[in-house]
Regions:
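Alpha-helical support elements that line or immediately flank enzyme active sites
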Residues: 312-342, 552-564, 612-624
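Inter-helical turn/loop segments and adjacent helix faces that build the functional surface
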Residues: 373-385, 496-511, 620-628
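Short, low-complexity, Lys/Arg-enriched N-terminal segments of secretory-pathway carbohydrate enzymes
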Residues: 1-30, 76
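Ser/Thr/Pro/Gly-rich low-complexity linker/stalk segments immediately outside membranes or between
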Residues: 53-83
Length: 746
């Protein structure tokens, strides 16, 4: 500011330094140029970070030319140089992100130097670049090479698919074409490319790409690569077609039992969405499997929706819960048969229905799916046909995802997520590559493995997996033994034992029950924290429990993973959920309390499966207080879904549950998706479960409601009593803790 005042008041003063002799108008002209440049670069940064799209190359070149010209005009002004330095850094960073550029020691990104020239550079923008490999490469931006992806110096690369499990691996999981398409940012969503079916066999397309692009690929090749993709690939989703659900009913009996008229109508509208989400695989996938990234299954299935065009593993459990509420037993059976087919042909159930998911799974919900179907149908013949597949899936997790940990000097076998890949995920290749730019080369393999492992967890992504609780580059998923995964594996043991017993296989039932009993002791020793009164993830690297508040700590209630002698644990867990602040929000339970991470499995986002497991875990207890709390959370979640549907006429993948105002959620690698399979399943299951009690919030009511009945008054009174009792219970629990402390230290 001092320089500016000096220039205006005393242009001839010696204190004016380097500005002496200049005119006010000349300085104002420079200031205007600086303002224009600042605005342009800010716009570039915003466009790159928020739009996530590549901008026309000439925009960057024009900005570069303006930077060069302005720097030469500014002379020796230190203030201007400092500002220009900041702008230069911001410009280069936005340029790198837009084109996924990794600076090389022997490479300049732009041929025009940014040092003062002997004569002012022209202010006109350069000639726009055209897409041709034969044009002059005056302005070249190199895409980063694949050295870190392909190198075996630290650890041999393990790709999402290769010649051992997918004949089209050179297109969809690795290779020059995949790398170029992702680094050139051809598509806004990385998943778009790897979902596209080929028009010809993969070997031919890969060879032709190498012939057409033999040298180093640069930003000049963007349009040529785009044209190559358009010429050799069909549209994503081309290999799937909508199908008819033969057992769909317009007015399922269970949905008609919902007493609240607005919620009943809402349930029937959600029931309609099943028809829009049904998919079957076209014959061309069977005839030419190598031309598709889609994994073939024989029967129709319900997809999540949006960018998720294929089936997904753990989603299907909650889809089946909703289909059962809609009375669609045959569709449930067919979807289970698809997974039976995958276990028989692949050996496990992958994350989803694409070849790039073949090296990771998702939370093991196959056995619970069969249990839910059998409970609804009592189809013993079908159950018998599923036994071998259930045992094989159970063995996969025991053999591939178990690890020994030490706690208090004793060794325990527990489960963890650990994907069998250590390179960028094909469906998020560009994002993973850029994340790894911030870490040492020696750590990139583990970083990529832990990113894929977080995707295997279903929580992709959450601060729960980050060492610093903030940024993806500190992810350490494979170093964590998750409390919810281990609780689900306990549930698998319990269900498998029960189903064997139902079929008269007493010996196997007893064997599984003994294993389950031992695992309960392991679970309590490894995960339960007496001071906190809840179960928490174990960090294998540090040997310590992570006591940050995540609703996963309530999953053992859902799977009933606790000793019958320790029922007080359930009340302690409810108290912990309350004390940590997870139950205070108007729309349900958020996936964490970590703010500012911009990850979709963090605050303020709530997800259907997490809310469902918490609600069901509390509801299945024998404690009236916990059952009442389950109803309260269910009412919040149902009303938030209902409110957003009235506003958007859509069901969403996730919801903002923390705000008083109503909206779908944000955050993560991709935009919130509509559909949505498991959201629909959970909402229908909960509305049927609480069909006699749950109501729309009065301010949101669409249909006039009849005057309150005595049963309504009873529910209100019960709620008030439960709240009062909860307060007393928490008081007693606190006194008990103090008493215990005094006994130990008195």
């Amino acid at each position: 500011m001092r320089v500016c005042r000096c220039e205006i008041k005393c242009r001839s003063s010696s204190s004016c330094g380097s500005l002496k002799g200049e005119t006010v108008s000349a300085f104002r002209s420079k200031r205007k140029l600086l303002l224009i440049l600042t605005t342009l670069i800010i716009a570039l940064v915003l466009a790159v970070y928020f739009l996530r799209e590549s901008l026309p190359t000439n925009v960057f070149l024009w900005t570069s030319s303006l930077l060069t010209s302005l720097k030469s005009h500014m002379g020796n002004s230190s203030s201007a140089a400092a500002v220009l330095g900041v702008l230069q850094t911001a410009y280069e960073q936005s340029q790198r992100i837009a084109y996924a550029i990794q600076p090389q020691d022997n490479q300049t990104l732009i041929s025009t130097p940014l040092t003062p020239a002997s004569a002012p550079a022209p202010m006109l923008p350069p000639t726009p670049i055209t897409s041709s490999r034969n044009r002059s490469e005056q302005y070249v931006m190199m895409i980063p090479d694949q050295e870190d992806v392909l190198s075996s110096a630290v650890e041999k690369p393990q790709f999402a698919c290769d010649e051992t499990n997918s004949p089209n691996y050179m297109i969809y999981c690795q290779g020059e074409l995949l790398h170029a398409v992702m680094m050139l940012n051809i598509f806004k969503d990385s998943k778009t490319f790897v979902d596209k079916p080929l028009k010809r066999d993969p070997e031919i397309v890969a060879a032709e790409f190498k012939d057409q692009f033999p040298g180093t690929i640069t930003s000049n090749d963007r349009e040529a690569v785009r044209e190559f993709v358009n010429a050799n690939f069909n549209e994503e989703g081309h290999e799937l077609e909508e199908c008819e659900l033969v057992d769909w009913q317009k007015e399922p009996e269970q949905l008609l039992s919902i007493e609240d008229p607005d919620l009943r109508q809402f349930a029937l509208q959600v029931n309609l969405i099943w028809k829009k989400l049904c998919r079957t695989i076209k014959k061309e996938v069977v005839e030419h499997p190598r031309r598709h990234s889609l994994i073939y299954v024989p029967n129709e299935f319900v997809v999540p929706g949006g960018r998720f065009r294929e089936f997904y593993y753990w989603d299907t459990y909650w889809v089946i819960k909703g289909l059962l509420a809609s009375g669609m037993h045959q569709t449930c059976k067919k979807m289970i048969l698809n997974f039976h087919y995958l276990v028989d042909t692949i050996g496990f159930i992958p994350n989803g229905g694409r070849v790039y998911y073949l090296r990771r799974s998702q939370p093991p919900m196959f056995i619970p799916m069969i249990y839910e179907y059998h409970m609804a149908t009592e189809d013993d013949e079908f159950l018998l046909s599923m036994l071998n597949s259930m045992e094989k899936e159970f063995s996969f997790w025991k053999n591939q995802r178990m690890i020994n940990v030490t706690k208090n000097g004793k060794s325990y076998a527990v489960f963890r997520y650990r994907a069998d890949t250590n390179v960028p995920r094909p469906e998020s290749y560009r994002e993973d590559y850029q994340t790894a730019e911030r870490v040492d080369r020696q750590k990139k393999r583990k970083l990529w493995r832990d990113i894929a492992s977080a995707a295997e967890s279903g929580w992709d992504f959450s601060s729960r997996w980050f060492a610093n609780r903030k940024t993806m580059d500190t992810i350490e998923t494979s170093d964590i033994a998750p409390v919810d995964l281990n609780a689900i594996m306990y549930w698998n043991m319990k269900i498998l034992a029960h189903l064997h017993g139902a079929l008269g296989n007493v010996e196997r039932r007893d064997e599984l029950n003994r294993e389950r009993s031992r695992f309960v002791d392991t679970f309590e020793a490894v995960f339960f924290d007496d001071r906190e009164g809840a179960w928490f993830d174990l960090n294998i690297r540090t040997g310590e429990r992570d006591d940050d508040a995540y609703p996963s700590l309530a999953v053992p209630l859902f799977t009933e993973c606790y000793s019958s002698l320790n029922n007080h644990m359930m009340v302690d867990v409810l108290e912990t959920l309350q004390r940590k602040g997870l139950l205070q929000f108007p729309g349900g339970v958020p996936t964490s309390l970590m703010k500012g991470t911009n990850q979709q499995w963090d605050y303020p986002n709530g997800w259907a499966p997490i809310n469902h497991m918490i609600i069901e875990g509390l509801r299945k207890s024998n404690h009236p207080i916990m059952q009442q709390k389950a109803f309260e959370i269910a009412s919040k979640w149902i009303n938030r879904n209902y409110q957003v549907y009235q506003k958007d006429k859509k069901m969403w993948e996730k919801y903002d549950v923390a705000k008083g105002y109503v909206r779908a959620a944000k955050g993560g690698e991709y935009e919130n998706q509509a559909g949505f399979g498991w959201t629909n399943g959970v909402i229908l299951d909960l509305m049927v479960t609480y069909s006699k009690r749950v109501t729309v919030i009065p301010s949101e009511r669409q249909t006039p409601r009849q005057p309150s009945t005595s049963s309504d008054a009873h529910v209100v009174a019960a709620a008030e009593i439960a709240d009062l009792t909860l307060g007393k219970l928490m008081q007693r629990s606190s006194l008990r803790a103090i008493s215990s402390f005094l006994k130990c230290h008195g």
